[in-house]
Amino acid sequence: MGLPHTTVLIFGLLCVFQPSHSSSDNDFTKVRAVNLGGWLVVEGWIKPALFDGIPNGDMLDGTQVQLKSVGVQKYVSAAGGGGGSVAVDQDVASSWETFKLWRVSDSEFQFRSLSGQFLTRSNDDVISATTDSPGDSETFFIERNNSLLHIKLLNGSYLQVTNNNQFTSNYRSQPGWGDGMATFEMTIVANYLHGDYQLANGYGPVQAKSVLTEHRKSFVTVKDFHLLSQSKINAVRIPVGWWIAYDPDPPAPFVGGSLDNLDRAFHWAQ
């Protein structure tokens, strides 16, 4: 079946604007299109304010960080980029000293090394990067004072540096910010992932639903479609995420509702 003569399409998903009765058959001889990015797929560079309310918003899922001991002034380093021992012995940070955050909550994180293994605690309290699938032993509470961190295991013990540059988890008391052996300075190397996953994971399910519902309702409206039509725009590209196929209950942490908004776009285009 061929496309009808229209005044506007949506493609990729593709939306079609219904022409007025006065439109001629030549109205659709040339496609004039715009992209409605940042609406049903979040793009932080388009609307960064969406992320403003996230606690520890500079530590979103996927952020790359480096950790430097305040006490010995050396960086935490996974030997070989991961898969083995971890020491606090490097004067200059590079890829072996860079860890990708997996965000569990606003204060719980997992640290993934360059080769894909996670920081983990062994039975002798030594930290290594040897686990491929993170669990409780790879999950750390972060206590933060600007760029300074205390890193705590679920059992209450804190990570520290020993005098021989070992990275251990046997600091049992509450460290102060002047305690250099259990205090680390965090440098954010890359924080460029600002999509639906980071937003929903950062806010949590309840607040993320509220934020995205308001955004989807107000970012693009029927008035915008009317303006496009009046401006002789006859095609609109609306990016959608793969999780729309599972609407209204997409896998966590994604928030349902984008399919309803896409349906509205087709209705507005009639």
Ranges and model annotations:
Residues 1-11:
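Classical eukaryotic N-terminal signal peptides for Sec-dependent ER targeting/secretion
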Residues 11-63, 156, 179-235:
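N-terminal carbohydrate-binding accessory modules
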Residues 18-20, 96, 146, 264:
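Eukaryotic intrinsically disordered and solvent-exposed regulatory patches
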Residues 34, 76, 119, 159, ...:
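Structural signal for hydrophobic/aromatic residues that build the beta-strand cores
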Residues 34-39, 70, 239-243:
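Active-site-proximal beta-strand/loop segments in catalytic clefts of secreted hydrolases
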Residues 44-45, 87, 130, 247-249:
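Generic domain-boundary/flexible-linker signal
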Residues 57-191:
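Lectin-like carbohydrate-binding module/patch detector with strong preference for beta-trefoil
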Residues 220-270:
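Aromatic-lined substrate-binding rim segments of carbohydrate-active enzymes
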